[in-house]
Amino acid sequence: MHPQQLVVSWFSLVLLASPIMAIWELEKNVYVVELDWYPDAPGETVVLTCDTPEEDGITWTSDHSSEVLGSGKTLTIQVKEFGDAGQYTCHKGGEVLSHSLLLLHKKEDGVWSTDILKKDQKEPKSKTFLKCEAKNYSGHFTCWWLTAVSTDLKFSVKSSRGSSDPRGVTCGAATLSAERVGVEHRDSWKYTVECQEGSSCPAAEESLPIELVVEAVHKLKYENYSSSFFIRDIIRPDPPKNLQLKPLKNSRHVEVSWEYPDTWSTPHSYFSLTFCVQVQGKHKREKKDKLFVDQTSAKVTCPKDASIRVQARDRYYSSSWSEWASVSCS
């Protein structure tokens, strides 16, 4: 649940008549009204106050209708559904004095709505809509999520290392990826964001998880999604680089060698990787047993038209495996 907040500035003031506070400021002049969503729900009584020293001659309109909704410095409305949300504007004569935008956050049967984002069907066991990965222990990580919504969509991302840790985590703006992902038999759009912990010590033991919150607004609907993780749990190295083959004299085997990816943490004697080596036949389904090694080379057979592929992961903590890097036997 999003922390509930009360806007107490004298201008553009938004108040509730109900005893339980269910409205808070998302950004300047934009407010989220939290509603229990069920048939015949009473909704929330909201009082809007015009941001002006003027007292007389004030009228109110909304973006749903040009008709005058009321007059005076305040306007009381009952917010029950999306038709009651939107932008409310106060005027005097032909001049706009101020406006407030109301968004709705639905709760059905005690659960906040999650309509905007979609879960990746490739990971049916995933408990979160947000997926994050880090290529190393530098404190830099990338997160992404999927949505079937293509227009009237806005995201903001917030992150921190625990709620009381002063070390901030800075996230950039969410960007739309060119990649399309199939979810529920239709294409979904993928958004990504890059984040960096301000004061990161790669060799230090993590005691507090990183908290990530993505706020999503689609038209007049507000939702938020969160994830909590340690960097060590989202590590996924880049693939090994510079794969090379060296024929061995009087042997059917070859020596395949590789190097640590440039993006992996150093020194490698401390931040060590382990590797998986596999021979893949001409037809992709023809795969031989996997060989696991800690060094950066291995001896394998390399039939004509086959290829050798290698992937990496953290040696001392069971991180995710990297993508495969491959070299042809031809």
Swiss-Prot record:
Residues 23-106 form the Ig-like C2-type domain. GO terms for cellular component: extracellular space; membrane. Glycans are attached at residues 136, 224. The keyword Signal applies. The keyword Electron transport does not apply. Residues 239-330 form the Fibronectin type-III domain. Residues 1-22 form the signal peptide. It is found in: Secreted. GO terms for molecular function: cytokine activity; cytokine receptor activity. SMART domains: IGc2. Gene3D superfamilies: Immunoglobulins (2.60.40.10). Keywords: Cytokine, Disulfide bond, Glycoprotein, Immunoglobulin domain, Secreted, Signal. Disulfide bonds join 50-90. InterPro entries: FN3_dom, FN3_sf, Hematopoietin_rcpt_L_F3_CS, Ig-like_dom, Ig-like_dom_sf, Ig-like_fold, Ig_sub2, IL-12. Heterodimer with IL12A; disulfide-linked. The heterodimer is known as interleukin IL-12. Heterodimer with IL23A; disulfide-linked. The heterodimer is known as interleukin IL-23. Also secreted as a monomer. Interacts with NBR1; this interaction promotes IL-12 secretion. Belongs to the IL-12B family. Cytokine that can act as a growth factor for activated T and NK cells, enhance the lytic activity of NK/lymphokine-activated killer cells, and stimulate the production of IFN-gamma by resting PBMC. Associates with IL23A to form the IL-23 interleukin, a heterodimeric cytokine which functions in innate and adaptive immunity. IL-23 may constitute with IL-17 an acute response to infection in peripheral tissues. IL-23 binds to a heterodimeric receptor complex composed of IL12RB1 and IL23R, activates the Jak-Stat signaling cascade, stimulates memory rather than naive T-cells and promotes production of pro-inflammatory cytokines. IL-23 induces autoimmune inflammation and thus may be responsible for autoimmune inflammatory diseases and may be important for tumorigenesis. This is Interleukin-12 subunit beta.
